[in-house]
Amino acid sequence: MRKRMAHFLNQKRSLLDVLYVYLSVSVVHSYNIDLEHPIVFGGPDSSFFGYSVLEHYHDNTRWVLVGAPKANSSYSSSVHTPGAVFKCRVHSNPERRCTEMDLGRGNKPRESCGKTCQGDRDDEWMGVSLARQDKSNGKILACAHRWKNVYYDSEHILPHGYCSIIPPTLQGRTQALIPCYEDYKQKYGEEHGSCQAGIAGVFTE
């Protein structure tokens, strides 16, 4: 009797396993990646070009935006490897050329960013993450999680992290975003860790 019961339970468990696998497979959505006709873009050596990648569409033009968080920037040549974001046109670009985007931050390694904020851009890793608003004419978010506030450098170096909000045209004035900075506030949970905003990013609206 026990053997029959054990055999019945094993059969039931096997049927449940098959049903579970079937249900799991039935909800999986797949898509094809064209391995025979890839579009390949390249960037500077040792720049981590491709660390983050984002598709962007504006004014009937398709772009691939690429983060290279260890790149030297042609717009910030005085800053030590701040990182860069490149734009690569998908069509009408037979040479597969990518150009660095000017985020409008100038050529100074240090920048004033508030009443008690002095930003240090060396090795900030701009382009570590990229995000886009999920709508037509969506803006772009490009972040540098290793950006530091050194205003209190005798006591604290505060790795707040920095993001640039880029217009959908990929040109013109960008908007600075430093979520973890507040005037006259020396700590932002640094006794437990570092904020480093921008290691990932998303638009909620």
Model-derived features: where do they sit?
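Conserved beta-strand/short-helix segments
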Residues: R2-E205
